[in-house]
Amino acid sequence: MKKITFVFMFLSSLSVFGQIDLVPDTVRYQQKTGGAIDTFDISIADLPSTFEGGISTLSLNGLSTNSLYQDLSSRKFQRFTKFDPLKFSAIPHLGFAYSFGGQGSQFVRLDYSQAFSEHFLFNLKYDRNAGLGYIQNSGYSENNLRTQLQRDAKGYSFQLKASFQSWDLAHSGGVVNSTSNYDVIDTLGLEFAAINKTDASSSVKLGSAFLKNYFNFSSDSLNHFGLTTHHHYTITNREYLETDNLSAIYSSINIDSSKTRDQFNWARIRNASGAYYSNRKSQLYLDALIEHGYWNFQNLGVNRDTNEISFTTNARIRIKDLVLTNETRLNLIGGFNEWSEEAKLKYKNGKLKVVAGLVLKNSAPDPFQRSYFANNFSYVLSSIEKQTALKVGGNLNWNVKDSVFNFVVSGDFNSLSSAYIFDGDLWRNDSLNSFSFGSVKAKAHLALGNFNIMPTLVYSFDNNGYLPSFQAYTRVYFKARLFEAKKLEAVLGVDASYTTKFNNRVYVPAMDSYNMFVAPGENQTNSLLNLHAFATFGIDEFRFYVRYENIGYFWSDRKINEQFGFPISSTRLRVGLTWDFFN
């Protein structure tokens, strides 16, 4: 099968005729599902974990400042996945990846791209993660479908995005915290450990649709002016079921002492219209829109709703190698005058790339945090106050020498002031609920002939100790082409990691939230040293790998938890493949 060169166009909005990103970045390379053969074995699947949903909390991503920010500001399994940058390919492309391993773990990735014409594009992505889990009653399945359709023309352009996500989770509530139970884990294995919940589960469904229209009224090929409309719809639905002697578990029983069925449905719609202007020569874009928003929150048959009016504006300008973008949102009516500001800077010159960003929000709690009624939880906030969130970060990528040495350094600072945090009963907003944390990360890739090393060092600071102060990761491998024809590419290596101790977070399944009011330091994960081994092979569009993960389980203390009640997971053998089909 002949090699095809793809052009990937990274678009933040629509087309050159009516968008913020007037001149999108263009990158040309040989497309491979999962990325380069050097790392594709870890790009399509998470590391082993005993935590709910199979989500790894001991990975570089799980111990990141971004993960902590999300755990503080949103529910664990109710987060919409961001859309990937839109892709353009000269002929249809289908990328497929599949991996399976111990504990019934399965990972599926599907990526389809087609250009009906040069200015009419379609993308589809589908991900599925599933497994039986390491401990009893911890099976899970996740489905995630995202589609994008874009038409780019002089008179009328549009971009349509739609997604559907679902989680079906069995909740163990973690293992029983007793010395005898951890002795069982040490001698017999994780699957024999007693758990806190034997009959608890939840189902989460997330849907979204986004449509942007651009009507250009100008006949000028350089200057465009016209009408733009934006339409956003999202819906979140969750159901939680539990059967047990609930009086012995919860302090409150509102409906039934033996069976729970908690449920809510949160639907939101926003429609905005306004004017835009763009100049293709100076690469300037400006728009201003007035938006009407409506949301409805249904909780066990009781409905609450609100109408809101807001103002939004977007801007983009390019000055030689520098690109600046800004998005501002201000609520005028119905939303407590919430506001947000998001700015980004991009600079690229030769082998140097710099990206910096700022997000500042002043927002009210969401409907779930304001009022909720369930079998074992019930609360109504007496007053609504706003919380402030700040995220500042950036990274520098320096390709010192092509195919030999690449260096990346990044840093971020995050602050949540007067944040609404779950305390085990309700969402509290007081002067104590302030969190500040950040990190500095340096990573590199050094290639010396067939020998490669990819080290990553992370220093984190966190006023509550939920992040390890130091993390070290390295991938060491040999890469070569085999046999006389040199068509078979092979990679053999190991991944090693070390993390210092950090405080556990306590997950509450019935609320899909963390109780952050457990005293910091009361439950800790001690320092850990881990190891994984892998071998990958590739020829043209087909690639295969085998991994043996969590080798560090052989020497680690089995009483160490990933998070409170969730012990470190045992070893796992996992194999996988990717295949790219063209035309």
Annotate each predicted stretch with a short phrase.
Residues I4-V16:
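Sec-dependent N-terminal signal peptides
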Residues N66-Q70, K76, F80-S113, G133:
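Short strand-turn segments of transmembrane beta-barrel domains in outer membranes
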Residues Y98-G102, F116, R128-A130, F164, ...:
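Short, flexible loop/turn elements at secondary-structure junctions
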Residues Q106-R128, N137-L169:
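Transmembrane beta-barrel wall of Gram-negative outer-membrane proteins
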